């Protein structure tokens, strides 16, 4: 009787450990990021994306993004343990040790780099590595704790995925790819500031100088509203350069209008839970916007 119990116990332990490591890669965040990578790939060519850069590129970028997320968990483990939103993460709860988290992050990051360098191209490998360093070290380890503009400056690393997808297919920079980077770069501040308003007390408790902590909630609401207007303009850039057609224009205009309206509500008609509604809508905004880019590309071309 003991042997089956041991097998069951071992299987259960392995399953729990696997889930803990998987959680450290922030799979939902990476999934949204991979959508923008895919759109970058598809928009880079007029026909179907070649199979090798598609599969190897998505796999390698996903591994390195997961590595960056795991490093974020490792670096933030102390403050994560003090915040209600993050206290149950694997490192604060002791489900994964700091040493094993570092080994895991280095392993999948190294594998991802090799995949991109060998099977895709060196340019994409190095750009993805730069994004990893920008997010995990420049933003998480320094900017996040150093300035209220942490999200604005550090947002560049998180805005890179469409460019990575583009270079994975073409092995070169292109102005159209940079327009996609600008969209995500402009989207990032209102997205995170809405969350920061909702979690202001927690950020203040752990001495993270998010904008609502350093400049107040009302100032942050104003900044969110202004950035949603700026984002609406950025979202029209692909139309202005002839990169997209009427279908994307309509979808972009509708999404931008709703985002601006919600930001206006947050500023002038705030109520309990509205900041989190704005935060959640921003996720759908980016997802639907890039899906519209993808669909329009094949309709327009």
UniProtKB/Swiss-Prot annotation:
By its UniProt entry, which Pfam families does this protein fall under? Answer: UbiA
Q: What span is annotated as the signal peptide, if there is one?
A: none
A single BP term in Gene Ontology: heme O biosynthetic process
HAMAP family xrefs:
CyoE_CtaB (MF_00154)
Which Gene Ontology MF annotations are present?
protoheme IX farnesyltransferase activity
| A Gene Ontology cellular-component term | plasma membrane
- What enzyme class is recorded for this protein? transferase
Entry EC number(s): 2.5.1.141
The UniProt entry's sequence similarity note says: Belongs to the UbiA prenyltransferase family. Protoheme IX farnesyltransferase subfamily.
Q: Which purpose does this protein serve, as stated in its record?
A: Converts heme B (protoheme IX) to heme O by substitution of the vinyl group on carbon 2 of heme B porphyrin ring with a hydroxyethyl farnesyl side group.
> Which pathway, metabolic or otherwise, does it act in?
Porphyrin-containing compound metabolism; heme O biosynthesis; heme O from protoheme: step 1/1
Q: Topologically, how does it sit relative to the membrane?
A: Multi-pass membrane protein
Q: Where in the cell is it found?
A: Cell inner membrane
Per UniProt, the keywords (alphabetical) are: Cell inner membrane, Cell membrane, Heme biosynthesis, Membrane, Transferase, Transmembrane, Transmembrane helix
Q: Where are the transmembrane segments?
A: 29-49, 51-71, 101-121, 123-143, 150-170, 177-197, 223-243, 244-264, 281-301
* Organism the protein comes from: Shewanella putrefaciens (strain CN-32 / ATCC BAA-453)
Q: Which InterPro entries match?
A: Protohaem_IX_farnesylTrfase (IPR006369), UbiA_prenyltransferase (IPR000537), UbiA_prenylTrfase_CS (IPR030470), UbiA_sf (IPR044878)
Its UniProt entry gives the catalysed reaction(s) as: heme b + (2E,6E)-farnesyl diphosphate + H2O = Fe(II)-heme o + diphosphate
Name the record gives this protein: Protoheme IX farnesyltransferase 1
As a miscellaneous remark, the entry gives: Carbon 2 of the heme B porphyrin ring is defined according to the Fischer nomenclature.
């Amino acid at each position: 009787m003991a042997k089956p119990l041991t097998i069951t116990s071992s299987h259960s332990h392995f399953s729990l450990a696997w889930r803990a490591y998987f959680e450290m890669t922030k799979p939902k965040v990476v999934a949204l990021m991979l959508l923008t990578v895919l759109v970058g790939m598809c928009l880079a060519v007029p026909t179907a994306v070649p199979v090798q850069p598609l599969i190897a590129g998505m796999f390698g970028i996903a591994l390195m993004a997961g590595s960056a997320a795991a490093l974020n968990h490792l670096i933030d483990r102390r403050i994560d343990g003090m915040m209600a939103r993050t206290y149950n993460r694997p490192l604060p709860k002791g489900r994964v040790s700091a040493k094993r988290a570092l080994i895991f992050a280095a392993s999948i990051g190294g594998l991802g780099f090799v995949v991109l360098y060998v099977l895709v191209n060196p340019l994409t490998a190095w750009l993805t590595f730069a994004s990893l360093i920008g997010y995990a070290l420049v933003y998480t380890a320094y900017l996040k704790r150093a300035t209220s503009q942490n999200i604005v400056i550090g947002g560049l690393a998180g805005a890179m995925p469409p460019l990575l997808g583009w270079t994975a297919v073409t092995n070169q920079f292109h102005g159209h790819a940079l327009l996609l980077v600008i969209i995500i770069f402009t989207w990032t501040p209102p997205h995170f500031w809405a969350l920061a308003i909702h979690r202001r007390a927690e950020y203040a408790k752990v001495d993270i100088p998010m904008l609502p902590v350093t400049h107040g909630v009302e100032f942050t609401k104003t900044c969110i509203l202004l950035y949603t207007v700026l984002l609406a303009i950025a979202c029209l850039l692909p139309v202005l350069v002839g990169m997209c057609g009427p279908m994307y224009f309509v979808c972009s205009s509708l999404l931008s209008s709703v985002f601006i309206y919600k930001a206006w509500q947050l500023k002038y008609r705030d109520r309990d839970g509205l900041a989190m509604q704005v935060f959640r809508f921003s996720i759908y905004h980016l997802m639907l916007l890039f899906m519209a880019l993808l669909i329009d590309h094949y309709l327009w071309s």
